[in-house]
Amino acid sequence: MIEIGKTIIKFPPLIEGILIKRYKRFLADIELDDGEVVTAHCANTGPMKGVLWPGGRVRLKYSPSPKRKLDWSWEQAEVPSHNEKKKCWVGINTSLPNKLIKHLIEANCLERQFGQISSIKPEVVYGLERKSRIDLLLYPSIQNEDSRKIFVEVKNTTWCDDSLALFPDTVTTRGQKHLKELMSVYPDSRAVLIPCISRSDMELFSPGEIADPEYGRLFREALTKGVEVIPCAFGFFIDHITWEGTRPLKSSR
């Protein structure tokens, strides 16, 4: 088990620079600290509310490959924290949260919530019309009292209001559908939503119904219909990511 505050993933040091602009959803121009201006791929196609700061510091991964159109990937952004005297690095790569949560489960960091897990399958087809894919499907060990499969949907969470982490940061019909799909698998299986809070300065999690009122309504309905919510927080550094523990849920308005 990985202790809170300890490293969960290590990687080569990222390259720092200054964000010039983000455009066409997938692209960002960044001036590196040596003065070179590069164009990086931005995996987060949403509005990036609260974390998009032109002139702010960012961190990039350099991974040239003939298979890639761009050699650079935007990984992290430095933003003002709710503590005005501090800043916080935020993970903005939306392909990372599934890997982080899978690491957590494999390291038994969520054993209290899930028990022993014998296997994990990613991107399994499920849902009312069999057209959705669940992020992680967990198969419990035979030692578990609850033998039901566990459907886990992971959401990258970067927006906040003071110390309250919020998801979504815009209207998301896809996210609304995921809540409906989770409700449909209960009670035959367990249904779990994990907001992956990609910053270490948040104290609570709540649905971002200011941005998407319908999502907030469905979120509260899901809670009454057996869907579990386990917000998990992480800290982002230049060469590693730390496990910062779970956060309480604030489901009321």
Curated annotation (Swiss-Prot):
Report the superkingdom from the record: Bacteria
State the disulfide connectivity.
Answer: none
Q: Which Gene3D superfamilies match?
A: 2.40.50.580, 3.40.1350.60
Recall the GO molecular function terms of this protein's record: DNA binding
Question: Which Pfam family is one of this chain's hits?
Answer: SfsA_N
Q: Which family does it belong to?
A: Belongs to the SfsA family.
| Name the UniProt record assigns to this protein | Sugar fermentation stimulation protein homolog
Q: Which organism is it from?
A: Prochlorococcus marinus (strain NATL1A)
